[in-house]
Design a protein with these regions (language model features):
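Conserved catalytic-core motifs of GNAT/GCN5-like acyltransferases
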Residues: 134, 145, 150-163
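Glycine-rich phosphate/pyrophosphate-binding loop shared by adenosine-nucleotide-utilizing enzymes
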Residues: 79-85, 96
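Short amphipathic alpha-helix that is part of the acyltransferase structural core
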Residues: 1-65
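Conserved acetyl-CoA-binding loop-helix of GNAT-fold acetyltransferases
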Residues: 103, 109-122
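Conserved acetyl-CoA binding element of GNAT-fold acetyltransferases
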Residues: 94-105
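Conserved GNAT acetyl-CoA-binding A-motif
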Residues: 124-136
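GNAT/GCN5-related N-acetyltransferase fold signature
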Residues: 76, 88-89, 103
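A short helix-loop-beta-strand connector motif used in the catalytic cores of GNAT acetyltransferases and
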Residues: 62-74, 97
Length: 163
């Protein structure tokens, strides 16, 4: 992961939040458990979405345990409340993948996700040519389409930067 990009991104998020932590899957999992916040992040903790019937234990969640979701994890907090969890990956030299983005359940629909994505895009313009996402359910697909992302294939959407 591009360290300069991550440092810039964390600095930008820091203007909006009390604390921004970046690190590993283990660090995110530990903080979610420590603050007893797992119930507010069902996709990341339990692999559960509105379109799925999955409900695994946090120790089995591929997001927090599997190698497919290695990358840089970022967590935004206000006081002791986690606001969002984000996983970013490099996909080659010019593509950023937003591997996972989950907003605290009761804060969804208030524009927070759009603001987070806008910050990611504005910082990413300096380092990447495009952003790729692979939404996990239809709500996420609709969100990314509203954010201007276009279907690249059957499972991922992309947005060109610097056009």
């Amino acid at each position: 992961m591009n360290k300069l990009f991550i440092d810039d991104l964390v600095e930008r998020f820091g203007f909006e939040l009390d604390t921004v932590l970046d690190g590993s899957q283990d660090g995110v999992k530990s903080k979610l458990i420590e603050l007893d916040e797992c119930e507010h992040f069902p996709m990341v903790c339990y692999e559960h979405t509105n379109d799925s019937s999955f409900d695994v234990d946090i120790s089995e969640s591929n997001f927090l345990n599997g190698t497919a979701h290695f990358g840089t994890w970022i967590m935004g907090l206000n006081e002791d409340e986690i606001i969002f969890v984000l996983n970013l990956k490099n996909k080659g030299n010019s593509t950023l993948e937003i591997d996972a983005l989950e907003i605290r359940d009761e804060l969804r629909g208030q524009g927070l996700g759009a603001n987070i994505v806008a910050v990611i895009e504005s910082v990413a313009e300096q380092y990447y040519n495009e952003i790729v996402v692979s939404p996990f359910d239809t709500d996420a697909q609709v969100f990314w389409e509203k954010m201007g992302y276009e279907w690249r294939n059957d499972y991922s959407l992309t947005k060109k930067l610097n056009d």
